[in-house]
């Protein structure tokens, strides 16, 4: 969701609370739980899951490996669930022509620097830069070139924007900020 007026442009940034992250976290959790249960049932010699008889899977080496994969998968799954619950990467970009200030806010991982807040003067923005790479792994990223700071990405690298969408977004933002567009 974006909000625009004559003097203010606010663009909300989606963080890690995306449908794909929810799906991967669920799949990884259920798969690793299955591996751990099969490894445990091979160790105990009892059928905890009725799909595989425990005699078919020996504890050494298959049961140990499956237990290890199950534990590793649970750790990775818990990491994904934590990033989803903390909503890492979400935030907003706020451009205020009236005050002449641009603000970037993102949520990070818990700790001292959880809130990432950057402020720049609009007069320091040199250009809006588009990086477009086509091919097997296309990459379309929008950057903002700032004096003394370099390029700051405005779109996520995993955002699948069509060339028309990124071009339109760059043109609208450059028009709003009254800066040129560079294409790389």
Swiss-Prot record:
Q: Which Pfam families does the annotation name?
A: Ycf4
Gene Ontology terms: cellular component = chloroplast thylakoid membrane; photosystem I
Q: Which family does it belong to?
A: Belongs to the Ycf4 family.
Localization terms from the record = Plastid, Chloroplast thylakoid membrane
* Topology class, membrane: Multi-pass membrane protein
Which InterPro entries does the record match to this protein? PSI_Ycf4_assembly
**Transmembrane segment boundaries:** 22-42, 57-77
Major location (coarse): plastid
| Source superkingdom | Eukaryota
Q: What is the lineage of its organism?
A: Eukaryota, Viridiplantae, Streptophyta, Embryophyta, Tracheophyta
Q: Which organism is it from?
A: Phalaenopsis aphrodite subsp. formosana (Moth orchid)
Query: What role does it play?
Result: Seems to be required for the assembly of the photosystem I complex.
Q: Which GO terms describe its biological process?
A: photosynthesis
Which residues lie in coiled coils? none
Query: Would the keyword Transmembrane be found if you checked this record's keyword annotation?
Result: yes
Q: Which UniProt keywords apply?
A: Chloroplast, Membrane, Photosynthesis, Plastid, Thylakoid, Transmembrane, Transmembrane helix
Protein name (Swiss-Prot/TrEMBL): Photosystem I assembly protein Ycf4
């Amino acid at each position: 969701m974006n909000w625009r007026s004559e003097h203010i442009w606010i663009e909300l940034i989606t963080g890690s609370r995306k449908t794909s992250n929810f799906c991967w976290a669920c799949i990884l959790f259920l798969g690793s739980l299955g591996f751990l249960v099969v490894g445990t049932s091979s160790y105990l010699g009892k059928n905890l899951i009725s799909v595989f008889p425990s005699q078919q899977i020996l504890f050494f080496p298959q049961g140990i490996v499956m237990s290890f994969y199950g534990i590793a998968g649970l750790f990775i799954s818990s990491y994904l669930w934590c990033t989803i619950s903390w909503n890492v990467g979400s935030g907003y970009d706020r451009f205020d022509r009236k005050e002449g200030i641009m603000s970037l806010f993102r949520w990070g991982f818990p700790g001292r620097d959880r809130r990432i807040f950057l402020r720049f003067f609009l007069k320091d923005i040199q250009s809006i830069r588009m990086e477009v790479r086509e091919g097997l792994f296309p990459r379309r990223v929008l950057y903002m070139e700032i004096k003394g700071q370099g390029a700051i990405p405005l779109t996520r690298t995993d955002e699948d924007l069509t060339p028309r969408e990124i071009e339109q977004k760059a043109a609208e933002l450059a028009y709003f900020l009254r800066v040129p567009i560079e294409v790389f």
